[in-house]
Amino acid sequence: MNEAFELFSKNIKDRLETNVKGEVTIWFVDDELHIKIYNHGLKFRIVFQNLTAMVVYGRMVPDRIVEEVLGKYRAFIMNKYFN
């Protein structure tokens, strides 16, 4: 894992854990970026697939969490790690 990704993943993990008051795990699988969030009994994954599409797995995912990832990080993730 390169240094830039380590710094990025720590930054997004810290931000998300603060904003959602939950546990956040981030990892890569091939060309997919996975963000798993466990929050007050809700567990879900946000996966950036095929470099452009985003899929959310889980039920009752709070809109503010999805917006946090989409609004703040989606463009950065795509530009920094997939271009």
What are these model-predicted stretches?
Residues 1-3, 80-83:
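Short intrinsically disordered terminal tails
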Residues 1-28, 56-71, 75:
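Negatively charged, low-complexity tracts enriched in Asp/Glu with abundant Ser/Thr
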Residues 25-64:
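Acidic, low-complexity, intrinsically disordered interaction modules
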